[in-house]
Design a protein with these regions (language model features):
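A short SAM/SAH-binding and catalytic strip from SAM-dependent methyltransferases
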Residues: 59-73
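A short glycine-rich, Lys/Arg-flanked "PGG" loop and its adjoining helix->strand segment in the class I
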Residues: 76-88
């Protein structure tokens, strides 16, 4: 999921007869990807959590900064949709705006965040790149309660770079 910054490299890196798919909310991005990255099958998705793949279809799914643009309801809807299309024992990698992003929160938001509540700032259309969600560990662990959390990676911020958390889960 996302604008192909990562998936465009996978056919060359992995090169073992795998099939690669990409999906995104942005129609122009998908059109560009279809024209310029023929090794990957792309489709446009809507904001609603519905993908055109059968149950238990993918071995690996990744979403780089996808949940960071969704409401609490769509966190649940999209996680459930990704879980649906992930094969048993499949692995999902998702990035979130965790503790590194607490500095961006107001005092009332920080209090709620520290209580394990998702914080959403949405003065723009949901799904837009400036619609922002901040995901505390407790919220994410509850979201992934039907899966095994293999790892939760938090990296320290660097000058001019604030890394997102990486969650690696297994169905």
């Amino acid at each position: 999921m996302g604008p192909a910054r990562i998936v465009r490299h996978l056919p060359e890196i992995i090169n073992n007869n795998c099939s690669f798919y990409g999906t995104d909310y942005n129609k122009k991005t998908i059109e560009w990807c279809k024209e310029n990255i023929p090794e990957v099958k792309f489709n446009k998705n809507d904001l609603d959590a519905s993908l055109p793949y059968p149950n238990d279809y993918f071995n690996v799914i990744y979403g780089n900064s996808v949940l960071t643009h969704l409401s609490e309801q769509l966190h649940h809807d999209w996680y459930n949709e990704l879980y649906r299309i992930l094969k048993p024992k499949g692995v999902m990698l998702l990035t979130t705006q965790g503790d590194n992003y607490k500095v961006k929160l107001s005092k009332p938001e920080l209090k709620k965040y520290n209580q394990g509540k998702l914080i959403v700032r949405g003065n723009v259309k949901e799904g837009h790149r400036t619609y922002s969600a901040f995901q505390p560990k407790r919220f994410m662990k509850n979201l992934f309660s039907n899966s095994v959390i293999l790892d939760h990676i938090e990296r320290k911020p660097q000058k001019n770079w604030t890394p997102q958390d990486l969650w690696i889960i297994k169905k």
